[in-house]
Amino acid sequence: MQDFVPNSSYTREELIACGNGELFGPGNAQLPVPNMLMLDRIAHISTTGGEYGKGEIIAELDIHKDLWFFGCHFPGDPVMPGCLGLDAMWQLVGFFLAWKGNPGRGRALGSGEVKFTGQILPTAKQVTYHIHLKRVIERKLIMGIADGRVAVDGKEIYFAKDLRVGLFSNTDTF
């Protein structure tokens, strides 16, 4: 495996490689693989910018009617589960921590307020995730705290405050 060199954007293939442990190296953060990978691309990632000036990520998921969750949630009334959008935001905070060069496996640690004000239907075209890093702790504890927004076809529909993700060198007792 080659040494990791951070990019400012990532393709679906690169995100799947991350899920297979090929991006950040063995024992380090991984994204889920399909079907739980809720991203098709990271359009932009930076240690600057965002609402707090501490970093941001913009990622996208292309929507099509044959996505796995539409067939079971709910029959006759298909909608993307809101928890999958929330999980995508946690996925992105963990990715950010590893992208900055921090070691360890990512685990979601919680969030503050979460609001759902809309839905993602199979007729939608694209979901956009926008993560605004508020704080990045890089000591013995490696943790990111961020606010996130989810939009469908340009309309904001979810908001999460204080998303927390940590990276751990040992998850045996987690």
Curated annotation (Swiss-Prot):
One of its GO terms (biological process) is unsaturated fatty acid biosynthetic process. The active site is at residue 73. It catalyses: a (3R)-hydroxyacyl-[ACP] = a (2E)-enoyl-[ACP] + H2O; (3R)-hydroxydecanoyl-[ACP] = (2E)-decenoyl-[ACP] + H2O; (2E)-decenoyl-[ACP] = (3Z)-decenoyl-[ACP]. Pfam families: FabA. Keywords: Cytoplasm, Fatty acid biosynthesis, Fatty acid metabolism, Isomerase, Lipid biosynthesis, Lipid metabolism, Lyase. The keyword Chaperone does not apply. GO terms for cellular component: cytoplasm. It is found in: Cytoplasm. The keyword Lipid biosynthesis applies. InterPro entries: FabA, FabA_FabZ, HotDog_dom_sf. GO terms for molecular function: (3R)-hydroxyacyl-[acyl-carrier-protein] dehydratase activity; trans-2-decenoyl-acyl-carrier-protein isomerase activity. Its EC number is 4.2.1.59, 5.3.3.14. It comes from the Bacteria. Pathway: Lipid metabolism; fatty acid biosynthesis. Homodimer. Belongs to the thioester dehydratase family. FabA subfamily. PANTHER family: 3-HYDROXYACYL-[ACYL-CARRIER-PROTEIN] DEHYDRATASE, 3-HYDROXYDECANOYL-[ACYL-CARRIER-PROTEIN] DEHYDRATASE. Necessary for the introduction of cis unsaturation into fatty acids. Catalyzes the dehydration of (3R)-3-hydroxydecanoyl-ACP to E-(2)-decenoyl-ACP and then its isomerization to Z-(3)-decenoyl-ACP. Can catalyze the dehydratase reaction for beta-hydroxyacyl-ACPs with saturated chain lengths up to 16:0, being most active on intermediate chain length. This is 3-hydroxydecanoyl-[acyl-carrier-protein] dehydratase. It comes from Teredinibacter turnerae (strain ATCC 39867 / T7901). The gene is fabA.
